[in-house]
A protein has these predicted regions:
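Immediate post-signal peptide segment of exported/extracytoplasmic ligand-binding proteins
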Residues: 1-4, 70, 121-140
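Ligand-site clamp/hinge motif
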Residues: 1-38, 167
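Short, well-ordered beta-strand elements
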Residues: 3-9, 136-145, 168-171, 189
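Short helices/loops that flank or line small-molecule/ion binding pockets
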Residues: 15-25, 39-42, 71, 155-164, ...
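A ligand-binding cleft/hinge motif common to bilobed small-molecule-binding domains
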Residues: 32-43, 197-202
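A bilobed periplasmic-binding-protein/Venus flytrap-type ligand-binding module shared by bacterial periplasmic
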Residues: 52-75, 79, 88, 263-264
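Structural transition elements
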Residues: 96-130, 147-150
Length: 274
């Protein structure tokens, strides 16, 4: 059937949007958590599942002294249970990733990066001790308060890191503050967020190049720079694919970030549409 009109409502707070969905004042809402989808049930809504096509991760400021050490960053990767985050927030429907690329990028995606780290708190403790942080260290995770999936993920991560001696403080800020202080200013220690990209593989990976304007993480790895530039400048597609995959493995093994998942996109659609 045709529709007489379509109204788009822009609601800054996710929880407020969900309340409106339950009240029937909106008919379609994306980015539900698994708990929200379960709360709705199936009497009035259909739940449609897709992918957000995001690299959901805890991004690290490599200029912050403990995080400047590869062993410390690797320890955080071992300390975070990606499956626990996926199961709790997205009902196990997300795709676990291990580098800054999503599966939808097809031939450019390196699946081997997914298994570089497994959940291993004891290994995390060993690496922290080797790096000179046997007693742990303090870490502030800044997260935009308007995105529940990022806040919930950060809370799980904080609990998991506490088990290996890392004392986490959560700093929830407004989205505008996050953009100004974290993304534009690079003034943070760690942050939980999701990044999207275009169909060009370079768009996903360029932000890790040492002198890139979007490298808010202050990440620097000369091998990565060389591999990325080879992929970016070559006209040979086989060489391009090979080096973009190699770049992903460098990010994974060097623990440039704690990569978590390409989150499931759960969309509620009112059954009034059939």
């Amino acid at each position: 059937p045709s529709l007489d009109s379509v109204e788009f409502k822009f609601i800054a707070d996710v929880d407020t949007a969900f309340v409106e969905l339950q009240a029937g004042t909106i008919d379609i809402l994306k980015y539900l958590t698994a708990a929200q989808a379960e709360t709705l049930g199936d009497e009035d809504y259909n739940i449609v599942q897709g992918s957000m096509n995001l690299v959901h991760a805890m991004y690290l400021n490599s200029a912050y002294e403990p995080l400047s050490k590869t062993e410390v960053r690797q320890a955080l990767c071992y300390a975070v249970d990606r499956d626990a985050i996926n199961n709790f927030i997205f009902g196990g429907k997300s795709h676990i990733i291990g580098s800054h690329m999503i599966p939808a990028m097809s031939k450019y995606y390196e699946p081997e990066a997914e298994t570089v780290y497994s959940y291993d708190p004891e290994k995390a403790k060993e690496l922290l001790a080797d790096a000179g942080y046997a007693d742990g260290f303090d870490l502030e995770i800044t997260v935009p308060s308007s995105y529940s999936q990022h806040v919930d993920s950060a809370q799980i991560i904080a609990d998991e890191l506490s088990q290996v001696g890392v004392n986490v403080t959560l700093n929830q800020v407004e989205w505008s503050t996050w953009l100004q202080d974290v993304y534009k200013g690079g003034n943070f220690q760690a942050t939980v967020i999701g990044f999207d990209g275009t169909l060009a593989p370079s768009d996903w990976l360029k932000k890790y190049v040492t002198d890139d304007a979007k490298n808010f993480m202050h990440y620097s790895n000369t091998e990565y720079d060389d591999v990325f530039n080879t992929a970016y400048t070559t006209v040979d597609d086989d060489v391009k694919v090979e080096n973009y995959k190699k770049a992903q493995m460098i990010l994974a093994e060097d623990a440039a970030a704690v990569y978590i998942e390409d989150p499931a996109n759960l969309v509620a659609v009112s059954k009034k549409f059939g």
